[in-house]
Amino acid sequence: PGFAIEEELLHIQPFLQEKTCIGSVVSCTGFFFTAYRILGKTASLFGFQRAPFIARVQTYGQKALLLGYKKELQIATVNISKSDILLRTLQEMLDTPVRMLHHFLEASLTNSNPLLHPARLYSLFHTWSRGKAYHEIPGFYNSWDEESSELLIACDNEFQQILKALPVRIEPIPTLLEYYDSYDARSLTRKIRSIIAFKHIPAPMEKTEKGFLPDFKSRYFTEDFPFGLLIIKSIADVLNICTPNIDKILLWGQDVLNKEYIHE
């Protein structure tokens, strides 16, 4: 998870040898940026663009459910001279084809979880007020609605403008409509609702005496806001690109989390 990357890099740093390869299954939570800052720009790094599968713990330390396997994976490398050997090793380990990206930003920037989760959370809970409880836990994906799709598409349009201003190829990071074989909010809603691997994933909520409340300790909040959407927003600011929909979600998120990410 994004919040643990810095701590783990600092922990292993004294034991690293020259040209030791350090990698992350999840790159979109700031792995490359954090590794550069801590290990220096000569560090040998690799990172996946998307996780190989969805994992859910069933029995802690013993059993997990692995769902939604990808047909193909993509990684970016930095300062790794024999990247072909790394590629073959990862393919053998995961039994999945792995392709090489051209730039580490192509792995660092994704319109997957950093956009998908916050947009859905906003649609689910933006009318929530402190003290309000819900009678049931909605499905995060199987009750996905057009409001969520419309906001997600709007955020992705802003994200695509950022990509166009960076030295990356557009092809490895398709629009969400392209990725989900959809053409508008309605078809995207149908598609997301139909994904079998997503079927039984609940919205992040916790049970209380009054009912169910949003679980602000969930990684959907603790990771995808500060280590996902905020990274995208920070790059947009450097490029002077306006992101009104991303801003709206971040402002709401920082309010319910009692944080300060951006200014109005």
Residue ranges and their predicted role:
Residues H135-E146, I173-L176, G211-K217:
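Short, flexible active-site loops
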